[in-house]
Amino acid sequence: LIAVHYADPHRENFQTGRAKALHDANIDYDVFATSFYSFWHGSPENLTNVLKTIAETYHKKVMVAEVSYCTTLEDGDGAANVVNASTSPLNYSIDPLGEGLAAAVRDSIAAVSAVGEAGIGTFYWEPAWVPVGNYAGAEESQKAAILASNIDKWEKYGSGWASMWSGPEGGGYDPGVSEDRSTHGSQWDNQAMFDFNGKALPAINVYKWVYTGAEGPVQVSSVDTAAYTMNYKD
């Protein structure tokens, strides 16, 4: 199957406009794919509406080509993460077992399924992009050494969006690769389906659970803090 892949399903008429342009230009393809990150791309309901419109109007299969969610706001390898405490909205729970991650994946699957037979599935991106060396789990006194070790490995082997050899600094082809090394490490390690030591999270079973269902123990995953101001004179 030939697929085209776009982002931003939340933008009004953006993807439907792209689908129309492809149709008008007689572009031959089979699958219209989209990214769907809940912190950027709107609601699952809107996603269903957009994909259903494209599927029914242009008789294409549709899918989610990228979905993910974070299990922590910590930086696993010393390369600043794309999704962090300033990202909004983070509308699922953030927990080390991946409950919020599993819910985000489940909702994306449900959104595609609601399209009907034209909805063919989802891909998770990127489930195995774990740190080279665990920067977050190190003692404060060890972090500088671990980061230096990570940088050496990133530059030699590549780990992030690109290694230095693909950019101007290394005589490569991509001017978008930064010399400050901000593209070299994993900026997605807090959204992997594995912890910072490479151990699979329970949430990796979500692709089985959407068919079988699952029950988990009732437990406290987070506690909201509240602040009150009182005027004792009144």
Describe these PLM feature segments:
Residues 53-56, 72-87, 95-103, 123-233:
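Aromatic-rich peripheral "rim/lid" segments of glycoside hydrolase catalytic domains that contact
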Residues 1-3, 13-89, 99-100, 106-114, ...:
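Glycoside hydrolase catalytic-domain groove-lining segments
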Residues 7-12, 127-131:
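Short, internal active-site loops enriched in acidic
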